[in-house]
C-alpha cells in the first residue's frame, strides 16, 4: 500500500508560532488581519488543535512572505 504524507498539526502549530516571532506578528495582529472577533482560532492553530482553512493559509503565507508548503509540516 502506498503511503501518503499527512499534516502534523502540532509541528505546523509550532511553525506558525515560529513564523509569527520571526515576523514580529502578535496574535492580536492576526486577529485584526482576519477580522476575528475573538483570537481562539489563532491559539488553536498555534497549539496544533486544528489547521487554518485554505483561505486563511493563503493569507498567512502572504503575511509571512512565504508559501503554504513552508507553513505546513508533514509526516512521511
Spans of model-derived segments:
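DNA major-groove recognition helix of helix-turn-helix/homeodomain DNA-binding modules
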Residues: 55-70
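Residues within the helices of the helix-turn-helix
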Residues: 17, 28, 58
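Residue-level detection of the helix-turn-helix DNA-binding "recognition helix"
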Residues: 21, 35, 47, 76
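Short alpha-helical DNA-recognition segment
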Residues: 24-44
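DNA major-groove recognition helix of helix-turn-helix
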Residues: 45-46, 56, 72-75
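A short, Lys/Arg-rich alpha-helix, primarily the initiator
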Residues: 1-25, 33
Amino acid at each position: 500500500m502506498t503511503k501518503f504524507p499527512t499534516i502534523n498539526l502540532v509541528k505546523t502549530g509550532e511553525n506558525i508560532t515560529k513564523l509569527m516571532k520571526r515576523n514580529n506578528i502578535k496574535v492580536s495582529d492576526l486577529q485584526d488581519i482576519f477580522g476575528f472577533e475573538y483570537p481562539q482560532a489563532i491559539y488553536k492553530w498555534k497549539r496544533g488543535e486544528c489547521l487554518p482553512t485554505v483561505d486563511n493559509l493563503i493569507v498567512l503565507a502572504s503575511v509571512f512572505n512565504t508559501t503554504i508548503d513552508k507553513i505546513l509540516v508533514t509526516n512521511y
